[in-house]
């Protein structure tokens, strides 16, 4: 049995990993980080799974940025210095940063190294774990035609809602093949609804826009370095110092939305284009966000909320019905596009657990999102 779980390209990763990597190189080049795999769904991994994963991770070490990829990336992101793309051209995954062990059905994956390097591992390793799981357990997905038909059917419903949608499904996709097919179908569907994907390689392949800004780990690091009280404020200030108003969607739930709004002052509220909702009740969040903008004298319709918390059609419809005409909205849809193949979906994460700011000591990081289920750390 030939196992196919591999990455197509060094850009087969989520856009925000690269945008964060650039910011880390600029601001925190000596910081270190540790990450750990968390098996939320209590999936049982078959014998030999860990070994296969190790092999797949070794293979990642061979990937490098091609000239075509470099040109595409640089043209797409004029706000990133050319030196970054030169750096990326020389970047290679170092499998020594990753430790994989398996005891019975339990899988352990740990990553450790300089943050600016280890930041790229999370998404590829998660997608490899998903794909390998389906391959090694031998379960059959639906046919390619059906995968495309499922996506097409969803898009016809989404079109009627008159909204924009991006694919955010790299990390927990069924496989690269399915992901590729999904983006191809979304692109060929040819309506105004589909606006891009978080996957940089597939954005290049299908001439669409790579989408994303930053993730929880950006704020988790700031909390470890500067204390929780200041994490959101300094995280956003630093982001704005690097990107000067570009990539202006702020992630708001790393330490609960309430704490976020307290620090989201008038300068930041004006500067950022909007925010991303990733946990907790979406409607409640939308109302709080609208209230926040109004309290700062800003028209909520000039701002956007990107919803990305485990969405499907019913959730999206509910959000649209509430937000229409009150505030700008867009949606990032993950597994519901890239892993709707009539099999059990993987519920796994790979999260930063500790960080070593250059002048400190190893500090555990935590995330207190708006849902207890999504908390990590102690």
For each of these PLM feature ranges, what is it?
Residues 1-231, 240-241, 351-378:
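Ordered alpha/beta subdomains of enzyme catalytic regions
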């Amino acid at each position: 049995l030939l196992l196919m779980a591999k990455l197509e390209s060094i850009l087969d990763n989520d856009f925000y990993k690269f945008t964060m990597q650039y910011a880390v190189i600029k601001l925190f080049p000596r910081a270190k980080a540790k990450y750990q795999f968390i098996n939320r769904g209590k999936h049982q991994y078959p014998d030999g799974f860990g070994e296969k994963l190790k092999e797949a991770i070794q293979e990642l070490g061979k990937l490098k940025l091609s000239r075509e990829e470099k040109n595409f990336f640089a043209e797409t992101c004029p706000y990133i210095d050319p030196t970054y793309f030169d750096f990326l051209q020389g970047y290679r995954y170092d499998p020594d940063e990753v430790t994989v062990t398996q005891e019975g059905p339990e899988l352990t994956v740990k990553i450790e190294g300089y943050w600016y390097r280890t930041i790229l591992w999370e998404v590829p390793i998660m997608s490899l774990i998903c794909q390998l799981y389906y391959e090694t357990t031998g379960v059959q997905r639906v046919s390619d035609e059906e995968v495309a038909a499922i996506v097409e059917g969803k898009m016809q419903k989404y079109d009627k809602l008159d909204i924009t949608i991006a694919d955010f499904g790299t990390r927990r996709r069924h496989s690269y093949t399915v992901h590729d097919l999904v983006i191809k179908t979304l692109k060929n569907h040819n309506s105004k609804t589909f606006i891009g994907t978080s996957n940089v390689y597939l954005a290049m392949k299908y001439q669409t826009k790579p989408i994303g800004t930053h993730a929880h780990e950006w704020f988790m690091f700031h909390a470890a370095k500067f204390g929780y009280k200041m994490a959101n404020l300094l995280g956003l200030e630093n982001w704005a110092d690097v990107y000067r108003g570009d990539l202006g969607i702020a992630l708001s739930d790393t330490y609960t939305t309430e704490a976020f709004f307290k620090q989201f002052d008038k300068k930041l509220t004006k500067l950022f284009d909007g925010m991303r909702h990733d946990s907790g009740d979406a409607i409640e969040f939308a109302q709080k966000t609208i209230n926040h903008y109004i309290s700062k004298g800003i028209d909520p319709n000039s701002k956007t909320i990107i919803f990305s918390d485990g969405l499907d059609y019913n959730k999206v419809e509910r959000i649209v019905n509430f937000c229409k005409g009150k505030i700008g909205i867009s949606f990032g849809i993950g597994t519901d596009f890239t892993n709707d193949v009539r099999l059990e979906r993987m519920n796994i994460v790979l999260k930063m657990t500790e960080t070593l700011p250059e002048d400190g000591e190893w500090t555990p990081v935590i995330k207190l999102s708006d849902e207890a289920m999504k908390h990590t750390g102690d």
